């Protein structure tokens, strides 16, 4: 996406939540923006720049392009209890400032994060904003191709407040018996009321721990032929490194390991 020369005042940003994603909670993010004084921030961009984002939309959605963007704030000055005098993220500030009907310039898609055409089992792992290409792949696999391949998606976050699209994937799981969706929280909060699943088919919300270790402990250690699985992943750099090592440890050949390294 292109970011032209511009100045963005965060006071002008509309943070009302999406009615389809957060029904009945239009001011869901207001408290957090108030608490951290995001309204005081200003972004100034002095030259035309481009930033790359993973696409969350899939081909059947046509010209509708969906991006998952996390606002990039300056470092926090603990002594002053305020943001440091550093420019906020140029691209995220620009995107957050856009309103329905505004025009932007986008090119692509680029990259090599493609679905391998085979009948092999597919294991997806996503973390944080790495949800974007997961949605694109999985919606294309099931909503368009109606695939019969065995597929699982393991999604990791610190707490429930970091999760999104979960209801969409739970619906996908109900529609397709060959798809399983699991969540792992590394630091569940008290208000999450997180109940730990007793095994893959047990009751509960999900697992506790880092998502790569959750996959190992609950699935790959019991799999008859993990080396035959295709592994797809996208997330923060440390998660990506852990998944790459996991795949190698279980004998998955490099050509069957694919990732979208948005954090690199």
Protein language model features and the residues they cover:
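Phosphate- and divalent-cation-binding pockets in alpha/beta enzyme and binding domains
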Residues: 114, 133, 242-246
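Conserved S-adenosyl-L-methionine
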Residues: 119-120, 143-151
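A short, basic/flexible loop-to-alpha-helix module at the beginning of a structural domain
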Residues: 94, 107-119
